[in-house]
Amino acid sequence: MKTNLSSQISLHRVSPRYYRPENAFEKSVLTRLEKIPTDIYESVEEGANYIAREIAQTIREKQKAGRFCVLALPGGDSPSHVYTELIRMHKEEGLSFRNVIVFNMYEYYPLSPDAINSNFNALKSMLLDHIDIDKQNIFTPDGSIAKDTIFEYCRLYEQRIESFGGIDIALLGIGRVGNIAFNEPGSRLNSTTRLILLDNASRNEASKIFGTLDNTPISSITMGVATILGAKKVYLLAWGENKAAMIKECVDCLLYTSD
């Protein structure tokens, strides 16, 4: 929305009509310059709980139809509140994940998936270890595979996603340089799962996990832009003022991709 707001909005400072339009006309005025639909919430918890409910509804609908629900999920801080609410719904409301397929969006390379600072380990500790998902329904890029097998490995990862009917919901954060998963700004729209070299900004950000820059892997196996946008629903999460400028670029500005 064409309004300079934080994800922590103080109601005495900003009128709700600027982020919670009352009718279709007000919404059309506020969103007329948006390239993608955008919702603003008063708090992280409110926004995260809404997305968790949307995910839970899709899981239950798929259960009733006797079908898998395929989720593409990241690690990182942005989705942590969503995962917390999903765990609560599992424990307190009986939400089952037995019909859920999870694909990890990316993994550092070279790095074992079992490493304490792997993205997969973060995803397990934040969500997967606390729900009743079948372990055979969890898939992650393997950061320990041989270099000469990466191309074929990535092709098979895409093939496995398609074998389950594609992704139902992709959950994303956005990096400080505007990356989704590890697709940097300007990545090809038709890119699929592949090995990429991390730029300096991404490595510096990742070094917080690995302790030092020297210990930080130089590359990552990541789902591509086409893989992510092929999902039936995509939720991009951004909390706090430090993401405001990046979200403005995503929502209001023209699209640019590399050749």
Model-assigned labels for residue ranges:
Residues 19-35, 95-169:
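Ligand-binding beta-strand-loop-alpha-helix segment within the catalytic cores
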Residues 64-92:
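Glycine-rich N-terminal segment of FAD-binding domains in flavoprotein oxidoreductases
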Residues 68, 83-84, 92-115, 166-169, ...:
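Active-site histidine-anchored catalytic micro-motif
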Residues 73-78, 172-176, 239:
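Glycine-rich beta-strand-to-loop/alpha-helix junction loops that act as flexible
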Residues 171-173, 216-250:
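Glycine-rich anion-binding loop/nest that anchors nucleotide
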Residues 181-225:
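Class I SAM-dependent methyltransferase SAM-binding "motif I" and its flanking Rossmann-like core
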